[in-house]
């Protein structure tokens, strides 16, 4: 009886993973033929201790196979992923890391590489990724797992939330949650080339 229950639970999980991967592949199918994707970006920085949010405008540039750039205020603020290298520029000061050294960015890199390949990379086996779908919106939540309490304290972000419009294949938003607030990028005016 226990074996039967275990097999049934395993089968259900496998079926759910396959369905989630299929939803994701449909949502990002448009990226399969696009080499470059551009959009207008709006960045909202929210700090719990501050009453007003800081809002700025910029651009999103995505290039296959693994480059994502969100540039704000003429380059003073930038979030850049080039393969496994991540560069964050805040008020002109650069901070660089890689997904090989900084594990919180591993799944983030895999998800974006999968988006840019039109879903060719399988994301269903990522242990720190959950997906949900409501109407035309597919939400991907990456919650990085720390190896120790010390590593958890050093993490810049507690989670990343991406929303994709399944009808238009557009990445609608990227939210990076951190202690005491969040940074959210919303995107519009897409051009697929």
Task: Identify the residue ranges that each predicted region occupies.
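Sec-dependent N-terminal signal peptides
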Residues: 4-13
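Sec/Tat signal peptide C-region and signal peptidase I cleavage site
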Residues: 15-19
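Flexible, processing/modification-adjacent segments and terminal tails
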Residues: 22-25, 30-33, 40, 45-46, ...
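Short hydrophobic/aromatic-rich beta-strand segments that constitute the beta-sheet cores
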Residues: 41, 68-72, 86-90, 140-142, ...
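Hydrophobic lipid-interacting interfaces of membrane-associated proteins
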Residues: 44, 75, 179-181
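Short, surface-exposed coil-to-beta transition loops
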Residues: 54-57, 74-76, 82, 155-160, ...
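An acidic-aromatic
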Residues: 59-110, 183-184
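Gly/Pro-enriched, hydrophobic low-complexity segments
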Residues: 130-193
